[in-house]
Amino acid sequence: LLPLSTAHAGVSVQYDSTRSFIPNSAKGGTILIDKHRSRMDVGTNASVIFDGNAQSMEIISHDDKTYTVLDKASAEAISAELEPALQQMRTQLQALPPEQREMMEKMMAERMGINLQGAAEQEPDLDLKKTDKSGESGGIACNWWQATDDTVLRYEYCVTPAKSVPYGDDLLKYFHDLKQFKREIVGTINRSGALQIPSLPIADVREIEGLPPISRQYQDGKLILETRFVSVTETDLPAATFNLPEGYSEQKLPGVAR
């Protein structure tokens, strides 16, 4: 009898990420991809397992030995559970003087990520424009695109054709699925005003017609985050790569019953 295989081939993306407003914030990480599934390890403390077909994300804390599931059902449950309480808080704030009300709204937004001013608008469609500048990361040459909102720079992507990147088709699928998750699942939560999940520099690979070995995010005209591919290689993926660790317990989001 042939031995059962405990691993199969997948794609490994090594990347570096730097937050410009935090000194010495450069961090390396790994994304493992197998068709519609992916796993990103963030240092040794956390992992994120994503299923593009199911549009489901499992956020794992190795320190606490817990995980949280974020999908369409949980996003809708969060909005439904928190909205009545938020509406009551908004009503109470209306009785405050304007300056005090503004101060409270700002404090809740900054400290708790709660939008008391009402439901957030869906992230606007951005204007994408190819520039004449070029770049390189991990030995991959690319050309810069800019994404602006009413002339305000939001993102920059250094783009290369998928065929120029090893396993480019797998990466195209990954980026497309992740962009859909951001738009539909994260968008559901943000539009409710219940919680505000920070925007992520995820390119729409269909619009830029390629892959971004370098992604940059801007806020108020200043660079706040840059992510670069260091390498893209084939790797053996153990059968348990996309499984939740044994012994970890689920930490449910507000309003979510499983």
Each language-model region and where it sits:
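C-terminal segment of classical bacterial N-terminal signal peptides
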Residues: 1-8
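Extended soluble regions of mature proteins
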Residues: 9-258
